[in-house]
Regions:
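Hydrophobic residues embedded in beta-strands of well-ordered beta-sheets
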Residues: 23, 175-178, 222
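A structural detector for beta-sheet-dominated domains
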Residues: 25-27, 170-172, 251
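Hydrophobic alpha-helical segments and helix pairs
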Residues: 69-125
Length: 256
């Protein structure tokens, strides 16, 4: 509060055994400006100091069945999500606190007990945190299931011999094309190697059949041709790289 550039604002503080007391005494004419500054600063303080403790508390209380390492992963996902400026929940955190503080002051209160206010007067803000945390837990579970499935497929591939020497994938996001070792188009929907057992496990829209074919063909080498570099970090391609590992070769500049 000492950085506030307001005339006739007097600040004092006292430290007691279990808490610190900050007193703001404003004798200026623009009380609304003072309230704005006050709510702004305290809202930022709540996000900086209270929020990390609240999230850990809720994680230990409501998701106690995760071990320490798993909780740390969830917290990492949560911290990363706070950087997402397109998430309306993330953006609404500050506003929810600010409005609660302003309403509290307008009710005629002249003091704010920090812990009590955070625990009992921030229902909207705490609901946002609960929703964010639940979303992050769900994302963690999906990522864990995804990695477990990838590991199963890697084990399956490593324990079976290749049925094809080389397969080319011309990746177009939709309507991608598979070519055999002679660079002839593979009709995957009518191939003898098509086996629907993998289609129910993982879905990538139009790439379902391609993934299914590759998991049955088990090529010794998978050459992926990417005509558009923006596809390089595509989820489906990342999955293929994880599954087939050193069998994958990426081509970005050939004419096929």
């Amino acid at each position: 509060f000492s950085a506030l550039n307001l005339e006739k604002l007097y600040i004092s503080s006292n430290s007691f055994k279990i808490y610190d007391n900050v007193i703001l005494h404003y004798n200026g004419n623009d009380i609304n400006l003072f309230y704005n500054y006050f709510c702004n600063i305290l809202s930022k303080a709540i996000i900086k100091f209270y929020e990390p403790l609240k999230i850990k508390q809720e994680l230990n209380k409501n998701f106690f069945y995760f071990n320490h390492f798993e909780k740390e992963q969830i917290l990492e996902i949560f911290d990363n999500e706070l950087e997402n400026q397109t998430n309306s929940l993330v953006l609404n955190r500050f506003t929810a606190i600010y409005k609660s503080l302003l309403n509290y002051i307008n009710e005629g209160h002249h003091s704010v007990i920090f812990n009590g206010f955070c625990n009992f007067r921030l229902s909207s803000y705490n609901a946002i945190l609960d929703c964010l945390l639940s979303n992050c837990v769900n994302r963690f579970l999906l990522e864990r299931e995804y990695l477990e499935f990838i590991n199963l497929l890697k084990l399956y591939i490593s324990s079976n011999s290749p049925k094809e020497s080389t397969i080319h994938l011309i990746y177009l996001k939709t309507n991608s094309i598979l070519l055999d070792d002679n660079k002839q188009i593979i009709d995957i929907k009518h191939s003898d190697l098509l086996n629907a057992k993998f289609l129910s496990d993982i879905t990538f829209s139009d790439n379902d059949y391609i993934l299914n074919y590759l998991l049955n063909a088990l090529p010794a080498q998978l050459i992926i041709h990417i005509p558009n570099l923006s596809y390089f970090q595509d989820e489906f391609l990342n999955t293929l790289r994880l599954i087939f590992e050193n069998r994958v070769c990426i081509c970005t500049d050939c004419v096929i």
